[in-house]
């Protein structure tokens, strides 16, 4: 049994005024947002907390500020080296004593970090769950005065979550190893069941739970149906979408490594600075590719889910899913890479029936308990029901996460151009009956032809069926949309059948409910296709704050960006770690003439003012 760590009681005078002072001095912000102040107050008081805050909602501040104010070192458990590196570099730029321990840290650096931790020189120490489980790390941590333990991306703890990692399950023992040390678990994506699992697994039974709104008002969401599952057409659609946003930083998610490299190459052939990223590259190569994306303006990362949480670049203007993820949690997490600076951004998803079939087959191949598999299957269907539905997309997602009072966002594709729908209960009954009468042994095209009474070389056994030709009242396109919608709803299921997909009936009780007329079915009429020549251009993904500047202000902004790029290259850090675009815009607009005026701009904390203030003023002067 490891010894209990030493821990000093927090000073009685510690309150939110001190936290606000740190927020202003270090981060350059006047006050907290949303539930941040409530979470910070609980941790400062030494109480356990679980916080579910939206991506870009400042989750890390909720444990970073208490770690700075409370005596000792704040231990942060984070799932990815890239994520740790990003946060540690940002903290160092702000004058906070932070360090990380991972496979990329040399023995000499490790020794220096442990010395700093023991001597009280360190505010925050970042480690991975694997690192905690290996060697003597826990023993060494027991010799340190810990101010708190933060578990970042806490959804990784839960088997019900979208990114379950077994090593996270062992973090519950920290409650016994470090009794009395307050713990905070933070995540951006956890439904009620996942939240309960996190609390139980981490032994946070007495924790205060804070769940903020999942609203991301700066994100414009849209989804577009793929055509006939054609990979070439989907690739062409992705290329067109990216070209429309040329010069903007973005992320394109693909479902496979081959698709990732193919799309990246196609974009490069078209003059786009596209970078492929997937788990097939070795660690050093992935690090280099990530560094390029973080450092280069207008770069587009084409990635598999291996990219996931490993980026905190604030000026990503769009996220495109060439292939949908596996759940609404994963969807919200991944589109959350866009617009973290609060400026307008886009989340665009391309989807089709073959995608849901692929997602379900992938689940079948994973070793998991039957109950878990059923839950994950339901999550897949809930995602596709949202994508193919006619309800405001953010509203649907927010209600899924428990915000029952969520209202339409007013900016997604559904709100901007509400799709026409038709009552498809009777067509659904006909389609289900046709699949059943045909013995559940044909594919989508054959079923539609059967409903229309147009099967080539029809045999007498088929033409004698009661369902032959009963769908002549609908068009070919309408029937395809009905069948697709039934697949998305799980009323029909597609089996691969050795490369010749067939469709069969889905959940029997749900099918019976349709037959009885107890389940409403609304199908969208003729959805917009992704490869139409005349696609309306969107502007939600544009950095309006920067692009709307007049000529003189724009010139100052570009000079500041060039200065930032040079400083970032010298320090081998991403440019946004020095200053975000929106901070540079404020500087260009206000033209501060002295350090006091510069220090009053949001995003310019005391550390950055001291480090860069004179250089910024000189750069401004040169622009004039």
What are these regions (language model features)?
Residues 41, 200, 333, 348-352, ...:
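Generic alpha-helical structural context detector
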Residues 371-403:
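Short, charged low-complexity linear segments at domain edges
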Residues 179, 246, 390, 440, ...:
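Flexible coil/turn residues that form the inter-helical turn or adjacent wing/linker of helix-turn-helix
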Residues 43, 242, 293, 387, ...:
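Short helix-to-turn junction characteristic of helix-turn-helix DNA-binding domains
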Residues 1-19, 375-377, 406-624:
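Accessory DNA-binding and partner-docking regions appended to nucleic-acid-acting proteins
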Residues 7-13, 17-26, 30-34, 38-60, ...:
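Helicase motor core with emphasis on the C-terminal RecA-like subdomain
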């Amino acid at each position: 049994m490891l010894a209990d760590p030493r821990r000093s009681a927090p000073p009685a005078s510690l309150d939110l005024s001190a936290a606000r002072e740190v927020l202003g001095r270090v981060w350059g912000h006047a006050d907290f947002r949303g539930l941040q102040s409530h979470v910070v107050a609980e941790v400062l008081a030494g109480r356990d907390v679980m916080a579910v805050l939206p991506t870009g909602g400042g989750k890390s501040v909720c444990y970073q500020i208490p770690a700075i104010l409370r005596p000792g070192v704040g231990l942060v458990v984070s799932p990815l080296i890239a994520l740790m590196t990003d946060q540690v570099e940002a903290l160092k730029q702000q004058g906070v004593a932070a360090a990380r321990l991972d496979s990329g840290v040399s023995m000499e650096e490790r020794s220096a970090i442990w010395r700093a931790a023991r001597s009280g020189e360190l505010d925050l120490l970042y480690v991975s769950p694997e690192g905690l489980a290996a060697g003597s790390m826990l023993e060494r941590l027991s010799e340190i005065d810990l101010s708190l333990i933060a578990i970042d991306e806490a959804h990784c703890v839960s088997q019900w979550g979208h990114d379950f990692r077994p090593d996270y399950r062992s973090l519950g023992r920290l409650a016994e190893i470090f009794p009395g040390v307050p713990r905070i678990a933070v995540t951006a994506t956890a439904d009620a069941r996942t939240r309960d699992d996190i609390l139980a697994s981490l032994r946070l039974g007495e924790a205060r739970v804070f769940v903020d709104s999942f609203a991301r008002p700066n994100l414009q969401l849209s989804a577009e149906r793929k055509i006939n599952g054609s990979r070439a057409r989907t690739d062409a659609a992705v290329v067109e979408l990216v070209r429309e946003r040329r010069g903007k930083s973005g992320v394109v998610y693909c479902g496979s490594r081959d698709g990732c490299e193919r799309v990246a190459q196609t974009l490069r052939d078209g003059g786009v600075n596209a970078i492929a990223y997937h788990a097939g590259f070795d660690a050093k190569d992935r690090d280099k590719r990530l560094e390029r994306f973080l450092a280069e303006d207008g770069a587009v990362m084409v990635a598999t889910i291996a990219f996931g949480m490993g980026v905190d670049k604030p000026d990503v203007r769009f996220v495109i899913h060439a292939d949908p993820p596996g759940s609404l949690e994963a969807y919200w997490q991944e589109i959350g890479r866009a617009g973290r600076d609060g400026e307008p951004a886009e989340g665009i998803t391309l989807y089709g029936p073959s995608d849901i079939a692929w997602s379900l087959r992938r689940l079948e191949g994973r070793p998991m308990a039957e109950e878990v598999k059923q839950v994950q299957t339901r999550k897949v269907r809930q995602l596709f029901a949202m994508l193919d539905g006619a309800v405001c997309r953010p509203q649907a997602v927010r209600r899924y996460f428990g915000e029952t009072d969520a209202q339409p966002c007013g900016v997604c594709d559904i709100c901007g151009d509400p799709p026409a729908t038709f009552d498809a209960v009777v067509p659904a009954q006909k389609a289900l009956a046709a699949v059943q009468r045909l013995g559940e042994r044909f594919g989508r095209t054959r079923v539609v032809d059967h409903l229309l009474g147009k099967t080539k070389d029809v045999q007498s056994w088929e033409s004698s069926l009661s369902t032959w030709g009963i769908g002549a009242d609908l068009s070919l396109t309408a029937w395809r949309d009905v069948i697709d919608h039934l697949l998305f709803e799980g009323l029909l299921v597609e089996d691969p059948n050795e490369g010749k997909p067939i469709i069969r009936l889905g959940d029997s009780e749900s099918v019976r409910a349709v037959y009885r007329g107890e389940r409403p079915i609304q199908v969208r009429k003729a959805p917009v296709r992704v490869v139409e020549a005349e696609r309306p251009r969107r502007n939600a993904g544009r950095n309006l704050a920067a692009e709307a500047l007049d000529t003189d202000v724009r010139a100052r902004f570009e000079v500041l960006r060039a200065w930032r790029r040079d400083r970032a290259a010298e320090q081998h850090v991403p440019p946004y770690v020095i200053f975000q675009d929106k901070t540079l815009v404020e500087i260009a607009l206000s033209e501060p003439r002295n350090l006091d005026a510069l220090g009053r701009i949001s995003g310019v904390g005391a550390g950055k003012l001291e480090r860069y203030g004179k250089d910024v003023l000189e750069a401004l002067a040169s622009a004039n």
